[in-house]
């Protein structure tokens, strides 16, 4: 049974709009990852944005819980139901239906669609929620309804805001399979398994803790797909279900070991972690030293360590990507599109860690011998810093031995090297959190962007805000303006904002806050709410931005065509004088690839293709071949831009014809992080400026070479350098005065020219036994070097003694060493002392 499809189809039949899974990287600075089905709808529940139409949605949301407040990483593999990646089925009502229908829908789906036995089902409600208690009695016997307090049956988003009682549906897995004293409703045993949580958001909690009824209460429900699949298939562990067993079987085949549940924690860890890794990489998260990329790295490296326990000594995780795509690519089609890229990224990361894991485990085991209860924080840091062992991986290894790590000491060492990694994820902490945006949305709704059609317009000032985003009635200082209709494009999708004027006030920036388009203006003449003002953008700047933005689309197409379909946008910046495009690719681009890409983009520009803009539903756009970005949230109809062979979803401003772009030059290619490359480029006027600067540089080179033929001048210069090198080499072969003491040839002297190392090497090569110390002065800088051959004397000690006389220091190998000095007046003393030391040693 395809439970995912059955769930979505069921609620679609009840008037719910099916919402595609939102990105794992949420549009929420307080969250590391999307960790619940309601996260994409958070702003609707809090009232920050208006209720959608229709006011009921359903989704199957991909979620990650590994890092931050919601972190299940440590438990994965050791319990039947913890996962770093899971799918959350949910149905949502935004001020539409409430408890009665939510309960009826849930009961109908569980009993008539899933066909779970009614005599195995139990329900919990909040102890004070008599309404829910009575409603449930229409469907289930009173004896099967349990009341619990706030701890179990009250949900809240935070210390303040929407909240309310919740009701949970439980499934009895059978008394015959469990014998724990905690196996009762409300206990901590596994017999009674929660499968669905219905949250009744009916209150608003104020800062002083008072609960006030919401005028339009809402519904938020969540049911884990992995859990309900296991129940439907009669399995006591999610890992024994059809969602995981094909992966576990593949692991078993690769390591040639049989999976047994009781001792199979490593199999389960790997099966879970490969799913997380595949989805995160597919959605643009890359392995990194901090933030989300570091969580991804921790997940994969934890899996690799468990692979090591199963006997894997070579990269193997990448071989599991195919089975994950086979299992989930039917619903999440982008997995198949990204499969080759994902495999390559995982393989490269595996090789990075496998090169150090063995040495790291040896160091871990050595320290383990000296550990009674607490493992050294210093050694844990060494494992992290030198061998790439995340702290939670070390803690995971210690947990198996019932030991703990000294985290305080570890953090101490981490703080001493702040530049190496961040200790925790931090939110944005900006002033917008306390801004008056909710009031503006309630009063006016979203204002209208007219900049696609107009460069200027007359418009009414709906609101004015100071620099702290607080509403004011008049504004002379710098602040924010909300126009009823605005021609100013707000920073979005990588495109920088328009500038221009509102009345006589200069517009420096335009940003979107909760879908409100606000322009930031310099201090100047007083503006008032309800004023009718003239707004106009800087059209020249807009045109240059449009040219660069359209060029990024052509660049994206060229990259996919030349490098492969695994390439996807990982970030962009579009300004009036340059573009920056980040994309997924596993290695640096060579000269030939860059030339091909540049040539391909310019060919598309020359083709003079008309820009075609269309508005259509998201699914229709995807079916048409348009490329959508994971870090963008699409709602309702989407805007599709076709530029020749390029077709993408985009809300930015663009040229009407590719010929308007002019010419395209790649300025730089570089790496951003593991698996992400960056191209910087210029077009149009910026391209002309780039070429002009290049020509000026060439002119300067000609002047320096004193030759109009640059290649000829460089060739001549190279020949001169070669000639000088030969002269220097020959000067190093100058005969050095020496004397023989007991069969050892000795040379101690000051030299003015020559390659000091080459001279010492030549001297040593001439004799069977030799000791040489030379002092050279160049530009007031003293260099010492000593060489020893087949003599019981160390060059390092010899040169160090002489250097100390000269106020310097140094050392090196027994056969060759160098040093530096400062005091020119003591050179003769140093030479004399060195000779005495040599003679004494012989």
Curated annotation (Swiss-Prot):
It catalyses: tRNA(Ala) + L-alanine + ATP = L-alanyl-tRNA(Ala) + AMP + diphosphate. One of its GO terms (molecular function) is alanine-tRNA ligase activity. Binds 1 zinc ion per subunit. SUPFAM superfamilies: Class II aaRS and biotin synthetases, Putative anticodon-binding domain of alanyl-tRNA synthetase (AlaRS), ThrRS/AlaRS common domain, Translation proteins. Its main location: cytoplasm. It is an enzyme of class 6 (ligase). Its EC number is 6.1.1.7. Pfam families: DHHA1 (PF02272), tRNA-synt_2c (PF01411), tRNA_SAD (PF07973). CDD domains: AlaRS_core. The keyword Nucleotide-binding applies. One of its GO terms (biological process) is alanyl-tRNA aminoacylation. GO terms for cellular component: cytosol. Consists of three domains; the N-terminal catalytic domain, the editing domain and the C-terminal C-Ala domain. The editing domain removes incorrectly charged amino acids, while the C-Ala domain, along with tRNA(Ala), serves as a bridge to cooperatively bring together the editing and aminoacylation centers thus stimulating deacylation of misacylated tRNAs. HAMAP family: Ala_tRNA_synth_B. Catalyzes the attachment of alanine to tRNA(Ala) in a two-step reaction: alanine is first activated by ATP to form Ala-AMP and then transferred to the acceptor end of tRNA(Ala). Also edits incorrectly charged Ser-tRNA(Ala) and Gly-tRNA(Ala) via its editing domain. This is Alanine--tRNA ligase. The lineage of its organism: Bacteria, Pseudomonadati, Campylobacterota, Epsilonproteobacteria, Campylobacterales. The gene is alaS.
């Amino acid at each position: 049974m395809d439970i995912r499809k059955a769930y979505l189809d069921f609620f679609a039949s009840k008037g719910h709009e099916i919402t595609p899974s939102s990105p794992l990287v949420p549009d929420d600075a307080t969250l590391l990852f999307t960790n619940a089905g309601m996260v994409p709808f958070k702003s609707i529940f809090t009232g920050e944005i208006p209720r959608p139409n229709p006011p009921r949605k359903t989704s199957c949301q991909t979620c990650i819980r590994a890092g931050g407040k919601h972190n299940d990483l440590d438990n994965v593999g050791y319990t039947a139901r913890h996962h770093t990646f899971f799918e959350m089925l949910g149905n949502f009502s935004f001020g539409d239906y409430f408890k009665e229908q939510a309960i009826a829908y849930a009961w109908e789906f569980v009993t008539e669609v899933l066909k779970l036995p009614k005599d195995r089902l139990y329900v919990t409600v909040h102890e004070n929620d008599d309404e829910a208690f009575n409603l449930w009695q229409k469907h289930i016997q009173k004896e099967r309804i349990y009341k619990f307090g706030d701890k179990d049956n009250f949900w809240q988003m935070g210390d303040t805001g929407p909240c309310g009682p919740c009701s949970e549906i439980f499934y009895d897995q059978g008394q015959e399979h469990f014998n724990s004293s905690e196996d009762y409703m409300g206990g901590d045993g596994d017999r009674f398994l929660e499968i669905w949580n219905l949250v009744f958001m009916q209150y608003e909690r104020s800062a002083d803790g008072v609960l006030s009824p919401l005028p339009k209460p809402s519904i938020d429900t969540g049911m884990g797909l992995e859990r309900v699949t296991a129940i439907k298939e009669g399995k006591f562990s999610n890992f024994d279900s059809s969602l995981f067993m094909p992966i576990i079987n593949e692991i078993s085949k690769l390591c040639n070991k049989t999976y047994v549940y009781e001792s199979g924690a490593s199999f389960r860890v790997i099966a879970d972690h490969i799913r997380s890794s595949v989805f995160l990489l597919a959605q643009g998260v890359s392995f990194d030293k901090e933030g989300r990329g570091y969580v991804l790295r921790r997940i994969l490296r934890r899996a690799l360590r468990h692979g090591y326990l199963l006997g894997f000594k070579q990269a193997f995780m990448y071989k599991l990507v195919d089975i994950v795509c086979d299992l989930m690519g039917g619903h999440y089609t982008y997995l198949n599109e990204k499969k080759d890229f994902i495999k390559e990224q995982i393989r490269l990361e595996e090789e990075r860690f496998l090169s150090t894991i063995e040495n790291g485990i040896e160091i871990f085991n050595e320290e383990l011998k000296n550990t009674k209860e607490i493992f050294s924080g210093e050694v844990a840091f060494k494992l992290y810093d030198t061998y790439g062992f995340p702290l939670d991986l070390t803690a995971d290894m210690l947990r198996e031995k019932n030991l703990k790590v000294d985290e305080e000491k570890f953090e101490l060492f981490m703080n001493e090297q702040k530049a190496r990694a961040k200790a925790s994820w931090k939110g944005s902490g900006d002033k917008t959190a306390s801004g008056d945006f909710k009031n503006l949305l309630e009063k006016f709704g979203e204002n209208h962007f007219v900049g696609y059609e107009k460069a200027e317009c007359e418009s009414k000032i709906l609101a004015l805000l100071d620099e702290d985003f607080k509403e004011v009635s008049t504004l002379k200082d710098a602040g924010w303006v909300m126009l009823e209709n605005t021609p100013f494009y707000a920073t979005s999708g990588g495109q920088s904002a328009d500038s221009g004027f509102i009345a006589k006030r200069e517009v420096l920036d335009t940003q979107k806050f909760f879908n409100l388009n606000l322009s930031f203006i310099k201090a100047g003449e007083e503006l008032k709410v309800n004023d009718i003002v003239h707004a106009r953008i800087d059209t020249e700047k807009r045109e240059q931005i449009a040219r660069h933005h359209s060029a990024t689309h052509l660049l994206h197409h060229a990259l996919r065509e030349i490098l492969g379909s695994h390439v996807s946008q990982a970030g962009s910046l579009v300004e009036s004088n340059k573009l920056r495009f980040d994309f997924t690719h596993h290695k640096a681009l060579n000269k030939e690839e860059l030339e091909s890409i540049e040539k391909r983009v310019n060919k598309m520009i020359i083709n003079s293709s008309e820009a075609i803009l269309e508005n259509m539903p998201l699914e229709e756009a995807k079916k048409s071949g348009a490329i959508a970005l994971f870090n963008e949230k699409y709602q309702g109809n989407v805007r599709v831009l076709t530029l020749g062979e390029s077709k993408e979803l985009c809300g930015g401003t663009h040229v009407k014809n590719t010929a308007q772009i002019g010419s395209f030059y790649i300025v730089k290619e570089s790496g951003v992080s593991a698996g992400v490359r960056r191209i910087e480029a210029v077009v149009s006027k910026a391209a002309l400026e780039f070429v002009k600067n290049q020509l000026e540089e060439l002119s300067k080179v000609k002047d320096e070479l004193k030759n109009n033929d640059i290649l000829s001048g460089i060739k001549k210069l190279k020949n001169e350098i070669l000639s000088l090198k030969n002269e220097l080499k020959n000067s190093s072969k100058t005969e050095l005065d020496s004397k023989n003491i007991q069969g050892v040839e000795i040379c101690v002297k000051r030299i003015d020219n020559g390659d000091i190392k080459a001279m010492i090497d030549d001297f040593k090569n001439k004799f069977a036994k030799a000791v040489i110390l030379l002092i050279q002065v160049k530009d007031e800088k003293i260099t010492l070097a000593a060489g020893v051959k087949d003599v019981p004397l160390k060059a390092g000690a010899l040169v160090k003694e002489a250097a100390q006389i000269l106020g310097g220091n140094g050392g090196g190998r027994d056969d060759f060493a160098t040093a530096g000095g400062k005091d020119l007046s003591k050179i003769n003393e140093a030479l004399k002392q060195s000779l005495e030391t040599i003679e004494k040693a012989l």
